[in-house]
Amino acid sequence: MACCGGGRGEGAAATESEAYLEGEAVREARELVAELCRHFYGQGWVTGTVGSITVKANDPALPLADQLIVMSPSGVQKERMVAEDMYVLSADGKVLSSPVSKPWPNKPPKCTDCAPLFMKAYLMRGAGAVIHSHGMETCIATMLDHGAKEFRMTHMEMIKGIKGHGYRDELVVPIIENTPYEYELTDSLAEAIAAYPKATAVLVRNHGIYVWGDSWINAKTQAECYHYLFDAAIKLYQLGIDWTTPEHGPINSAKRPRSVLSSSIPNGCPDSKSSKHCVVLDIEGTTTPISFVTDVMFPYARDNVRKHLTSTYSSDETKEDIKLLRIQVEEDLKNGIVGSVPIPPDDADKEEVINALVANVESMIKADRKITSLKQLQGHIWRTGFESKELQGVVFDDVPEALKHWHASGMKVYIYSSGSREAQRLLFGNTAYGDLRQYLCGFFDTTTGNKRETRSYFEISQSLGVDSPAQILFITDVFQEAVAAKSAGFEVIISIRPGNAPLPENHGFRTIKSFSEI
């Protein structure tokens, strides 16, 4: 009997031994899940038998990936849950122990419908526990910006409770569409997990949320923070306050300027079909000289990659970076990408692994590849450079004034770059003009999609929640990006800056040499 399918490895037998299955670790995990179900019922997260919880049965003698899994059942009153109601699964999802049937009116026991989704978090993120909540705030949070594919928030204290985030960081939670049956969400959940490597949760529109963590404590803590933040966003929305921007000003209350960014009709009211609500900016060759990226940023990352990997090798962040690089290099080797070399397994000598990683990263940088694994590692290396003041972000002189003007006019400004979101924040947060992030509402990188593909711009328009893609102005220096954005319905301007590549003749786009021309 399998709860969610999957083949079994040769090592599974050891974890399924009678001693482990009937031992203290599994017993404690059963009791813990029952206790958490009762607790979350009081929170309003698992009422009406909905929602579910799963944890790994912690045995220090076994790697987390090989530990048994305890899951709550489906259709059982969570406030009456006891340890004997739990299912126990192997590490690959096979049911090893089921609860006994109870007399009427209890339903026959059934493993949670969330099982295949839980397994995605276990297998793709190495989770130690996963929580599925139907808390009211998780549903309403997906309705605040109809059609948005992400929930975004920044400058709220409780964001610090989410792994990898600080007060000034932007929290981004992917939103997937609901389906009639829980198991039908499995593929879209997996796609969201893959597309958002820093995320520890996925929202399901009009449904609830899946939250995972390294342990049950981490998962519970993050779930509490997420629910708090969603509740805060709902209350801020009711007050007309924008929760997505650093200053939390009024929502869409500022008067729009009469310019390319805003058209007006005779009575002075903005035309909702044509007025520009958002500006999306490229970085290289648009806000920042290409030479700064090619002559300063890239060399710094290249020259410090070995030092960074050596000093942070055992950190969770670097382990995740290495994991992404392994996946990319395996694909590169299959595709015959020049410069790719095999990376030894995790249990190999540290220096051998680092040597292979450095060789691959240097090759990727030389080829200027726009891939998430490289950009994420570069962002972490650059963070050290900015923190030590070895690096300072560079922008063209006209950029700060334009950002201030748009911000004062109530225009939302976003960045879309091949560099990681962290790298973008570092660049704009450490300039000679001070911290320019206060004028920016969000950041998009290659996790959204390739910048030369129309689909990526469609995703951005969905995330920004505009009525029409035509309400977004995109400024870039790359012709192919301009074509893709225009195909998605954006208004597009091409930036002409020193060092930019020449444009094709009769390209058909408006061009500017300074943001002051907009």
Swiss-Prot record:
Note accompanying the cofactor annotation: Binds 1 zinc ion per subunit. Binds 1 Mg(2+) ion per subunit.
InterPro entries named in the record: Aldolase_II/adducin_N, Aldolase_II/adducin_N_sf, Enolase-ppase_E1, HAD-like_sf, HAD-SF_hydro_IA, HAD_sf, MethylthioRu-1-P_deHdtase_MtnB, MtnB_viridiplantae
Superkingdom of origin: Eukaryota
Stretches for region Enolase-phosphatase E1: 279-518
Record keywords: Amino-acid biosynthesis, Hydrolase, Lyase, Magnesium, Metal-binding, Methionine biosynthesis, Multifunctional enzyme, Zinc
Disulfide bonds: none
Residues involved in substrate 1 binding: 114
Record EC number: 4.2.1.109, 3.1.3.77
Binding site for Mg(2+): 282, 284, 477
BP GO annotations: L-methionine salvage from methylthioadenosine
Any single Gene Ontology cellular-component annotation: cytoplasm
Pfam family for this entry, one: Hydrolase
Ligand binding (Zn(2+)): 132, 134, 207
Membrane-spanning intervals of the chain: none
Region (Methylthioribulose-1-phosphate dehydratase): 1-242
Positions of the catalytic residues: 157
HAMAP family documented for this protein: Salvage_MtnB_euk, Salvage_MtnBC
Official protein name in the record: Probable bifunctional methylthioribulose-1-phosphate dehydratase/enolase-phosphatase E1
Naturally occurring in which organism (per UniProt): Oryza sativa subsp. indica (Rice)
